[in-house]
Amino acid sequence: MANVVENLGKLERRVTISLPKDTVQKEIDARIQKLAKTVRIPGFRPGKVPLKMVAQQYAGQVEAEVLSDKIGQEFFTVSRAENLRVAGQPSFEPKQEQAEDAYAFDATFEVYPEVKIGDLATAEVERSTTSIGDAEIDRTLDILRKQRVHYHARGEAGEHGDGGEDTAAKNGDRVTVDFVGKIDDVAFQGGTAEDFPFVLGEGRMLPEFETAALGLKVGEQRTFDLKFPDDYHGKDVAGKTAQFTVTMKKIEWPHLPEIDAEFAKSLGIEDGDLTKMRAEIKENLEREAKRRTQSIVKNQVMDALLKISELDVPKALIEQDQQRLVEMARQDLAQRGVPNAKDAPIPAEMFAEQAERRVKLGLVLAELVKANGLEAKPEQIRAEVDEFAKSYEDPKEVVRWYYSNQQRLAEMEAFVVESNVVDFVLGKAKVTDKEVSFEALASASAQA
């Protein structure tokens, strides 16, 4: 049976677990008898191996398994009897002094902390707001037009003109070039190409290369020096100066589609109505703005909660979360196609600060939800699923997809709980509204 629970620190505890030897031995005997029915030993048929021989060969292994099971069961019983909220897994060590009739082990573990959340009225939150008008719609249309850009040979007449009298390469043109690069008069890997296309001004090439191509006409060439940056991805040439010769093969000027009925149809407006197109773009932008403002204000609320909360964080939970973050990082590498990603040597220490924040925040949120009844209701979950599904072509299929998988539904439930917490805190905290542009909102949410 358990002795008195000892306090070893703020959260660390120790308790003695005692297991009667006769109880342990009975379980060992029972398992060996069961094992004897299936164990295979050369010279004996299955089930015919003498019990004594099975015991001699497997007693140590079986004893270790029985002790492990019994210790775990007894610790669970003790923790419930003592109302211990155990955080993480306990460690067990045999006591130096053992009784004749019992095995004794010290169980060392951590308990969940007491969470003290300060007065929410003292929490300060800055809430970003934005409005969607014609300027935001026009900027979005510009982006959509650029995504549908097509090119025409500069100087050649076509349905959209010839691109102007000046046939030299300009920023925005798509050019096709041959180039040869050498370092100390020796060609290097990746330094030579034929019929290589790129768009001037997009920054795909190094600045010196783009500058050299600007102003060239078809058939012209230019020789220039280019110093590779010290941190260039090609280690063999990083920090070195190469001499390039570039020859212009083709110059194509960009033509953006007109904003007309055909353009609207390409965006899914079946009748090509431009008013409907702008209304749909506005609706999508408002939905995106809402999502981004919610994300930013959620982070603001979480930061505010951490500032007014007091608690100690169990090391065991931090270590567990570090391992989760390591596995998430490996999965991300695997999705990017990195070879042997599942065995990537990612040190858990690099996630220590992030894990501590996540665990601390989880404990604070759990306390706030429990104390104020902020659990997610089924109708709230369904409303969020429906809202999310609106942005897809077949909303009903998206709803079915969510409700067919418990993990996805659990993720949405967690989102709803967080939203409940945010709304609850905003209703009590000092909230300052700040109007920001949609572009600033996008930038802020990307950094959050």
From Swiss-Prot:
GO terms for molecular function: peptidyl-prolyl cis-trans isomerase activity; protein folding chaperone; ribosome binding. The keyword Oxidoreductase does not apply. InterPro entries: PPIase_dom_sf (IPR046357), PPIase_FKBP_dom (IPR001179), Trig_fac (IPR005215), Trigger_fac_C (IPR008880), Trigger_fac_C_sf (IPR037041), Trigger_fac_ribosome-bd_bac (IPR008881), Trigger_fac_ribosome-bd_sf (IPR036611), Trigger_fact/SurA_dom_sf (IPR027304). Residues 172-257 form the PPIase FKBP-type domain. Its main location: cytoplasm. Signal peptide: none annotated. Gene3D superfamilies: 3.10.50.40, Trigger factor ribosome-binding domain (3.30.70.1050), Trigger factor, C-terminal domain (1.10.3120.10). It is found in: Cytoplasm. One of its GO terms (cellular component) is cytoplasm. The keyword Cytoplasm applies. Pfam families: FKBP_C, Trigger_C, Trigger_N. It catalyses: [protein]-peptidylproline (omega=180) = [protein]-peptidylproline (omega=0). It comes from the Bacteria. Keywords: Cell cycle, Cell division, Chaperone, Cytoplasm, Isomerase, Rotamase. One of its GO terms (biological process) is protein transport. Its EC number is 5.2.1.8. Consists of 3 domains; the N-terminus binds the ribosome, the middle domain has PPIase activity, while the C-terminus has intrinsic chaperone activity on its own. Involved in protein export. Acts as a chaperone by maintaining the newly synthesized protein in an open conformation. Functions as a peptidyl-prolyl cis-trans isomerase. Belongs to the FKBP-type PPIase family. Tig subfamily. This is Trigger factor. It comes from Burkholderia orbicola (strain MC0-3). The gene is tig.
